[in-house]
C-alpha cells in the first residue's frame, strides 16, 4: 500500500471460532480512519453506512466496514443485542487496524448505528479506563447509546456526536437519556422529518455532512499508540 493510491480490499478477522468479513477503503494520504459498527440486523453491505463511508472517503478518510456477527449469529435475535459481544468483536477490529502497519498510525474514529453505537461507546470508554485515548471521535446514527453501560457513558472522553431522526421519537428520548450522562465533548443533532432509517429525501446526505465535519475536526492526531486491547 502506498500513500498515492486508493486501496480497496476485502478482509477477514479471526476472533475465537468466528471469522468477521470486512471491506477496507483507504484513500491516498488519509487524514484518519473510521471503523463502522453496524446495528442489529445490518451488515457491512448496509446501503446507508456505505453511503456515509463513501462521503468520508471522498474527504480523505479511510473506512473499515465489518460484520460484527457471522451470518448464523445474526439470525439469533438475542445475540444481535449482546452489547458485550459486539464490543469485543469491535475491539478485535481495532486490534487488526493497530497491527496493520499501513494504517496503524492514523487517528481512529468509530461510527455506530443502532446497537453498534452502544458497542462503539463502550469501546471508546475502555480506552479511557485503560489510560489510552486511541479513539479520537465517535458518531452515532440512529443509535442506541442507552444500551451502553452507565459507567461507559460517564467515562468516555472521545468527542461524541449523536444523530437522530426527528420522527424517531422513542430513539430521541433514549439518546437524550444517554446524553445527560455523558461528560465528554458532545452534541445531539436531530434531523427534522427523518425517521429511523433516514430514508427521506436529503436525510442521509445531512447525516453524511455532519459525520464528515465531526471526523475531520477530531481526526487530527498524526500518531496513536499501537496497543492491542486486552480481553
Model segments located where?
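Serine-hydrolase catalytic machinery in alpha/beta-hydrolase-like enzymes
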Residues: 11-103, 199-202, 206
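Alpha/beta-hydrolase fold nucleophile elbow
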Residues: 102-114
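Glycine-rich nucleophile elbow surrounding the catalytic serine of serine-hydrolase chemistry
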Residues: 112-122
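A conserved short beta-strand
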Residues: 131-145
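Short beta-strand/loop motif that positions the catalytic acidic residue
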Residues: 156, 162-164
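Conserved alpha/beta-hydrolase "acid-adjacent" motif
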Residues: 169-174
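Catalytic histidine neighborhood in serine/cysteine hydrolases
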Residues: 182-197
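Catalytic active-site module of serine/aspartate enzymes centered on a nucleophile-bearing elbow/loop
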Residues: 202-231
Amino acid at each position: 500500500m502506498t500513500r498515492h493510491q486508493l486501496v480497496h480490499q476485502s478482509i477477514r478477522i479471526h476472533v475465537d471460532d468466528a471469522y468477521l468479513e470486512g471491506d477496507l477503503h483507504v484513500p491516498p494520504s488519509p487524514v484518519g480512519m473510521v471503523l463502522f459498527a453496524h446495528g442489529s440486523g445490518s451488515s457491512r453491505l448496509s446501503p446507508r453506512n456505505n453511503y456515509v463511508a463513501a462521503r468520508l472517503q471522498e474527504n480523505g478518510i479511510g473506512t473499515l466496514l465489518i460484520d460484527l456477527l457471522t451470518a448464523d449469529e445474526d439470525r439469533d435475535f438475542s445475540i444481535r443485542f449482546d452489547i458485550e459481544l459486539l464490543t469485543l468483536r469491535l475491539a478485535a477490529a481495532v486490534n487488526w487496524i493497530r497491527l496493520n502497519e499501513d494504517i496503524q498510525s492514523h487517528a481512529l474514529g468509530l461510527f455506530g448505528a443502532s446497537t453498534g453505537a452502544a458497542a462503539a461507546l463502550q469501546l471508546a470508554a475502555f480506552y479511557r479506563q485503560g489510560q489510552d485515548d486511541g479513539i479520537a471521535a465517535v458518531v452515532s446514527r440512529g443509535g442506541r447509546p442507552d444500551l451502553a453501560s452507565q459507567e461507559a457513558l460517564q467515562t468516555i472522553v472521545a468527542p461524541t456526536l449523536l444523530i437522530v431522526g426527528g420522527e424517531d421519537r422513542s430513539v430521541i428520548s433514549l439518546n437524550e437519556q444517554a446524553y445527560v450522562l455523558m461528560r465528554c465533548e458532545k452534541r445531539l443533532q436531530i434531523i427534522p422529518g427523518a425517521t429511523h432509517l433516514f430514508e427521506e429525501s436529503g436525510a442521509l446526505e445531512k447525516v453524511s455532512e455532519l459525520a464528515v465535519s465531526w471526523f475531520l475536526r477530531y481526526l487530527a492526531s498524526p500518531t496513536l499508540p499501537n496497543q492491542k486491547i486486552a480481553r
